[in-house]
Amino acid sequence: MLTGCGASSPTPPEQPQLSAPVNLPFDLAVNVFSSYLSQTAEQACFAASSQGQCRNDGIASNEFLAGLEQLSLFRELSPSVSRHDYELLIANQLTETPATQQGSTKDQPLQSFSEFSVEWRGVQLDSFLVHYWHQDKVTPQDIQQIILRWAAHAEQQHLFTTPYLYKAMGASDYSGQLVLPQTLGKFRLSQQYLYPDPFKGVLARYLHPEFTDAIVDIAVYPVLAPLTHNSAQQVIHELEDAVEQAKTIAAERAMNIDIKKHQHPISDDTGNIHGMMSELAAEGDDSEALYASIYLFRLEDKFVKFSTTFPSRIGDPLVIQALRELTVPGESALMKELRQAL
């Protein structure tokens, strides 16, 4: 398709040749789709063409895909099929020459404008335009150089990291606004894991210095429903889901599960925070009983779930201490917008 309007081309600049990365820069799977240039990018192409003519997909989508495969930037590529959360959309236009409309002339070298857009489940996180000059024709090496320029931008901006995803989506800032106790009794905060999904939030794990099997997990994640819904019912439903997951795991391990307490009320030491808990024990034919206590609360617009590997008589005071010291982020822009649409 030809479109028109534009001005004379400037003198070609020097274009440093970038080297392909030695190690895998983006250790994830991504969908790859062909797309269309944004209006701003189209205008840049028209302005660069002395004849005001630019051709959509001047570099074919399969050529970009071949370049991505040769450079091995991602763990896996899924062309034209939505299998993964991340998507890479590539749009391209090529300036046309006045004589042949096919390649370069001495006075009119080819220029390409390639726009790379990164999306997560259909939400755009970033867009970057690569302007590249070609001698005589577009070569596979040219295409790799175009891709490498975008990849350098992606690495510099940390596009495929979880913190970038949360910030770009307008999700809660767990790193800056979540306050966790450093210790719970003799348990110490061992690690804090931010899920690569803003709807799953964060998990903090506490370990005991003497008993390696003793674990306390605190998960904080948004309530995926309007806040006008009954809070107590939301907590009960979420706890029931957690208990069902525990039952499934026990069944997979051929273990019998015994529910010691179920949907048992629990409050903090001020009586202002109310939640529910369940205590379970699982036992196999040739193993000792395994205990799990699960506690569910709603603070701000978040569920706070405590999971322990021991009975509630040990877990209750630890949970009450944690509630005393815990502060969760308020409602994020992402969840506010989502709840308005529900």
Predicted regions mapped to residue ranges:
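Coil-to-beta-strand transition motifs
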Residues: V123-L125, F211-A214, D286-A289, R298-K305
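Short acidic low-complexity segments
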Residues: Q70-H84
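Signature of long, low-cysteine stretches enriched in small and polar/charged residues
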Residues: H84-E87, A91-Q111, T248-S293
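C-terminal motif of bacterial Sec signal peptides marking the signal peptidase cleavage site
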Residues: L2-G4
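Amphipathic beta-strand/beta-sheet edge segments enriched in Tyr/Trp
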Residues: L88-V138, I294, R298-L299
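N-terminal "mature-domain start" segment
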Residues: P10-N62, A152-R205, E210-T212, D258, ...
